[in-house]
Each structure stands twice: as structure tokens, then as C-alpha cells.
């Protein structure tokens, strides 16, 4: 979660959201989650690009035309976000449930929580990548020790 907070601060967000968790997982030096994401063609840059495209499409749905224009980059916040958004609370809840307790929580559990989100920025962005998210979810579940995720 420390890396997710860093991601949120880099984008100037007042809260840590699901996209920050996903970007943090993609940048995680821990091999399991990185290999799982790579197996689906989802490296950190591809995820970032999908999030940017989702943002442009959301603006378009609100009537803001950005075709042919480059969006300004995010401004880093001087203050670290101290709050978690609802999407992160869901990720943590699902991750802890998959791990059976907080002490066993690993990045793969959080990735499973991210992949189980049904609505919001991250599911829309991941859909834009064309990655087989059902297969990725199955691979994540298989990677968990003793198949702890049974709920």
C-alpha cells in the first residue's frame, strides 16, 4: 500500500484509488505478480496507457472533446494522500478474505481484489487492453498458497 500511496501522490490525487494500487502492483519487484501481469500482456506502461485512454473516454462521455489534444500531465502533490477511496477498501477487503488474515496478505491477493472490481475506472481501463481477465484471475488464484482464495 506504500507504493500505491506514492502513485497517488505522483498523480496529485487526494485519495488512494484502485488505479494506484494496480500501478503499484505492476511496479512491484515481487516476481509472482509481475509475471502474472506480464503473462496477460499487462506491464506498468500498458496499464498506464489504458488508464489514460479510459480517462479520455470518460471525458468524451461528459462532452469534453480531447481528440488530437495532449492532456496535461498530472501534478505531483506535496502532501501524501491519507485516505483510501472506496475501491481500495474493496480491494483490501477482498484481498484479506483471500489471504484468510492480514498477516498472510501478499501482492497477489491485492491483484485478485483489483481483478474482482466490477465497476469503476480500473475495470473499464483493463477492458480496453483486450487482456483475458478471466484467465488472469484464474492464474492469480492458482498462484495463491494452498488456494487460500475459495470465497
Residue ranges of predicted features:
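Histone-fold recognition with a strong bias for associated Lys/Arg-rich disordered tails
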Residues: 1-151
Amino acid at each position: 500500500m506504500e507504493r500505491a500511496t506514492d502513485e497517488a501522490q505522483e498523480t496529485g490525487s487526494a485519495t488512494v484509488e484502485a488505479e494506484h494500487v494496480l500501478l503499484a502492483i505492476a511496479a512491484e519487484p515481487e516476481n509472482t505478480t509481475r509475471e502474472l501481469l506480464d503473462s496477460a500482456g499487462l506491464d506498468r506502461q500498458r496499464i498506464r496507457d489504458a488508464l489514460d485512454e479510459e480517462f479520455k473516454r470518460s471525458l468524451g462521455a461528459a462532452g469534453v472533446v480531447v481528440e488530437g489534444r495532449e492532456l496535461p500531465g498530472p501534478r505531483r502533490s506535496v502532501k501524501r494522500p491519507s485516505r483510501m477511496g472506496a475501491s481500495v477498501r474493496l480491494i483490501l477487503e477482498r484481498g484479506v478474505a483471500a489471504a484468510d488474515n492480514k498477516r498472510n496478505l501478499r501482492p497477489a491477493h491485492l491483484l485478485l481484489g483489483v481483478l474482482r472490481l466490477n465497476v469503476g475506472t480500473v475495470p473499464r481501463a483493463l477492458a480496453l487492453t483486450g487482456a483475458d481477465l478471466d484467465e488472469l484471475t484464474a492464474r492469480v488464484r492458482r498462484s495463491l498458497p494452498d488456494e487460500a482464495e475459495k470465497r
